[in-house]
Amino acid sequence: MYGCKYPSFTQLINTFIAYLGLLTFSNSTWANTAGVFPPVVQEGHRSLQYRVTLNPDTGAFGTRLHYQESLNDDVMLRGIVHASESATGHSKVDFVQAELFWDLDEDTDRLRHGFRFDARARGRGEPSSVSVNYALQYSVSPQWQARLAVLNTRSFGDKANTDIQFQARSQLSYRASQAVSLNLEYYSQLGAIDNFNPWKNQKHQIGPSVNWRVANGWTLYGGFLSSMNNSSPDTVYRMWVTKAF
């Protein structure tokens, strides 16, 4: 309609492979690669996703690769690998993580909710963790959608802080067209669930993002987050590439 030319399938493949290569060249001080996960599970869903984030102040990259597949219309499994390279050039895998999504509602419900259970394993004596997380999603209209996620994480191991750590994330999304959605996202890390940190020690980030459903199962995501206090990077740029099968 506006003379825009979609990238070819070959161009998307090459772009995806190029981003994939960053997985082994990421700075260890990685930025926020998290998302506001939905409670929705779609039967027959399978996808591969690569995420890259950049803190322009330090040049630090965060990278993550995951594969997910639904078992039915209620349960989905996801596997994640996160790798990095230190300032001295030492490459390592930071962690691997397994996730189970449990959708508690029907596809026709406007109000959806569900759980996500996480198990994260780290090497080199670093603490591993488990999480029990809850997500809520409400479709206000065919165009507008609101989402909230709360995460409760407990670490274990010799160096672990055994307090249950609390996070909250939210997203307001507007579907501008069949291909494009515009979002406003918020992320916070508040501290121990029974004793929140003071504001100056909490982490709060907010910013816009856009989802572009391109073609042939490809989706591109781009956006940035800005800090609401001095405990997070001033700005973090984020890009995700997803291929559904």
Tell me what each language-model feature is.
Residues 1-11:
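N-terminal secretory signal peptides that target proteins for export/translocation
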Residues 30-245:
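Transmembrane beta-barrel domains of Gram-negative outer membranes and organellar outer membranes
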Residues 6, 15, 117:
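Alpha-helical and His/Cys-centered functional microenvironments
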Residues 18-19, 29-31:
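Cleavable N-terminal signal peptides
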Residues 11-22:
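Sec-dependent signal peptide recognition
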